[in-house]
Amino acid sequence: MYAIISVGNRQYKVTQDQEFLTEKTGKNAGESFDAKVLLFAESSNKVHIGQPELKTARVSLKVLEDVKGDKIHAYVYKRRKNYQKAWGHRQKLQKVKVVSLSAV
């Protein structure tokens, strides 16, 4: 059984007990929450397609820990103008586990 959920402007294909990284959701480590937007669910031989989302299916998630993504470096310069600028960025992420998945 799997489902396609939307968390933080991104879509994820998830299964039971799967762990994945998502953008920071505003929840603290150890807190549980439900995926608000469930787009697709498949169980045994039944397929449930949301138009645009499913109301009956439910996916419960638990935040395991807060992590940071890889460092991204950016650099800009303008030739012959003695202008250059460099900066970096690390995205704040959360490791999330699928606790329960039901497509009723």
From Swiss-Prot:
A biological-process GO annotation: translation
UniProt-recorded Gene Ontology molecular function terms: rRNA binding; structural constituent of ribosome
GO CC, one annotated term: ribosome
Keywords: Ribonucleoprotein, Ribosomal protein, RNA-binding, rRNA-binding
Signal peptide per UniProt: none
Keyword Ribonucleoprotein included in the entry's annotation: yes
Family: Belongs to the bacterial ribosomal protein bL21 family.
Quaternary organization: Part of the 50S ribosomal subunit. Contacts protein L20.
Described function: This protein binds to 23S rRNA in the presence of protein L20.
Protein name: Large ribosomal subunit protein bL21
Species: Leptospira borgpetersenii serovar Hardjo-bovis (strain JB197)
Primary gene name: rplU
